[in-house]
Structures are given as C-alpha cells and as structure tokens.
Amino acid sequence: MTMEIQQLVGRMGGVLDAFTTAVYVDRDIEAAVALLADPCTLRNVPAGTGGESAAEIRRYLAEDVLPNLPADLTIRRVTRTADQRQVVVETMVGFTHDRPLPWLLPGVAATHRRAEVLAVSVVSFRHRTSLGTTTSRISSHRTLWDDTGLRTRLGVRPDGSSL
C-alpha cells in the first residue's frame, strides 16, 4: 500500500470516527450530516431503518435516533479494516433497554434489560480532489447485527411481544 493510500485510509477512519462521535456522543445532527456525500444511504439492515438522502438521514437522526438513545449506551470498537473505498468495523454495542428504540428495535416496548450485541458496519466513501486536497465523505453506511440474539436477550419475539 502506498503512503498516499495509507493516508487516505487514515482520513476515512477519521471521518467515520467523527460521524460516530457526532451522533452518539455529541448528538450533533448537522456535524454528522456534514460528513455525508450527496447522495448517501444510511441503513440499519435488520431493523430496516435509516434514510436514502441527506434530508431523510437528518429526519431519521432527529426523530428516531437522538431522542431515543439509551442513557448508558456504550460503543466499543473490536476490529476495523479498510481499503481505499470502504471501512468495515466490528463494534460491541451495550445498553439497557430503558426506552423504545425505533432505530434499533422498531415497535418493541422497553424491557429494562441490559444487552450487548456485536454489530458490523460496512461504510463506503466517495473521494473528491480539488487543488491537490482530497476530501472523503460517507456515501453508504450499512450496519448489521444478530437481531434474533438481541431480541432473545431482551426477551422479545420478532413481532415485539414478550417471550
């Protein structure tokens, strides 16, 4: 891998880290959306939630995600690998299901149980170079997790009813 590609991959990781921080730590929608390419897709695959444009993603973050983040949400990176077009990151997500989570478990009432789930995100980037400077923006952010295992730990069936 050339030095230029290594630097590009490092910048992509920085953009992804900034997006994660903007959403889950700072809860700053505008900072998160500023890191997205146009067009962009954000999809939580098992839940079928997310958006297909900056406007949809902004609405999704403002209405479904930020007001519904668990108080004790933790996100710990397990592994990350990248090439010049995408980053694949494996994270352990922990939380107490203390409120409805329409972005993660649509239609499921709070169970007040603690859970951890391993999530894998595949994040693609679009790069633009102008006057010798390359900027990278997220063009696709897809996250998958063991939905059945998570629901089992929380004591709910696929239809949202209790086990």
Question: Where in the sequence are the language-model features?
Answer:
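C-terminal and inter-domain tail/linker signature
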Residues: 1-163
